[in-house]
Amino acid sequence: PALRAGDWVICDRFADSTRAYQGYGLGLSMDAIETLYQIALGDFVPDLTIILDVPVETGMKRIHDRDGDPDRYERMDIGFHERLRQGFLDIAGHEPGRCAIIDADADIDTVTARIFGCVTQRLGVSLQP
């Protein structure tokens, strides 16, 4: 409804996450994943997908250092996380007009500034942190 009304919708996971987690990470059939995408979404494609990229070791350290228990994906081995990261990078490489890779191996203020800069550049909208 919000998209039909012309509103912006921001979500932290979408179809690329399914491709990366289930396809690249777990090895499920990409053809099956794409078929499900077509059934669920048809020809809908986001205007912008921001991929926050960090080395796997950095991501694992952040998971370990934060409060709360890791979820089932976060508990998976480093090989899974390497495949997952590569999946997101491959997706971005195949759709550079839609996907932007943000180097997230920095403090939160720097990463936030990079995201806002990307949105400004790609969508022509000026955001303030």
Stretches with model-predicted labels:
Residues 57-129:
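NTP-dependent small-molecule kinase module
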Residues 13:
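Walker B catalytic acidic pair
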Residues 16-17, 106:
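Conserved beta-strand edge residues that scaffold enzyme active sites
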Residues 10, 48-50, 100-102:
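Hydrophobic/aromatic beta-strand patches that form the interior of the parallel beta-sheet core
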